[in-house]
Amino acid sequence: MDQAGSSVEPEARYFESDGASYPNNPNLPVLIYRGIFNSNKGSIADQFEESFRRNRWTGCWRWSVYDFHHHHSNAHEALGVSQGHARLQLGGPQGEAFDVSAGALIVLPAGTGHKKLHSSTDFLVVGAYPNGQGHYDTNRCGSLDYDQALANIAATPLPNTDPVYGSEGPLVRIWG
C-alpha cells in the first residue's frame, strides 16, 4: 500500500448516457472515496498533490469545479477535495447530486458529466489526470458531436494506477 495507508473502498456509481450531450462512460463507474486524507498530517491539498505525483497522475491544478455541466471525452479526472464542502452533480443534468467534503476523492471516467451546484466559500479541489492525458477537452452541452465523444471515450486508455493507492489500489481492480 502507498503512503495513504490502508485503502478506503470507494463508492462506485454508473451513470447512463442522455443519448445526446452527456455520454457519461458506458463501461466505467465514477469512484467516490471519502476520508482519504485529513489535516492531522498537514495540508490536504499537499497530500493529494504528493499522492497524485507519486502515482503518475499529472497536470495538477488547484481551484474549484465549474458551475456548469461539462465533461472531458478524452481524459479521466481525479478531484481531491482539499478544503470546505460542496454539492456536485455527477452524470450530467439527469445525474445525481453528491455531498463531498475535505478529504474526499472523486475519480471521473472519461465522458462523465459534472458540475458544482453549490459550495462553501473555502471549497478547494486539487485536480489531476493519468499520465499522458493532460491535454483534455472540456465539453459543454452540444459542444462536441455525440458520436465523436463516444469514440474519444472508447480510445481513452485506462490508468495504470489508482491516484492515491497506486498499482494495487481500488481503481485498478474496479476499472481493470
Language-model features: locations:
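A short, N-terminal "cap"/entry segment at the start of jelly-roll beta-barrel domains
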Residues: 1-70, 171-176
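A short beta-loop-beta micro-motif enriched in histidine and acidic residues
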Residues: 64-78, 93-94, 100-102
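Short, conserved beta-strand element in jelly-roll/cupin
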Residues: 72-89, 107
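A generic structural motif
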Residues: 89-91, 117
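Conserved metal-binding segment of the jelly-roll/cupin
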Residues: 100-120, 129
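Double-stranded beta-helix
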Residues: 117-176
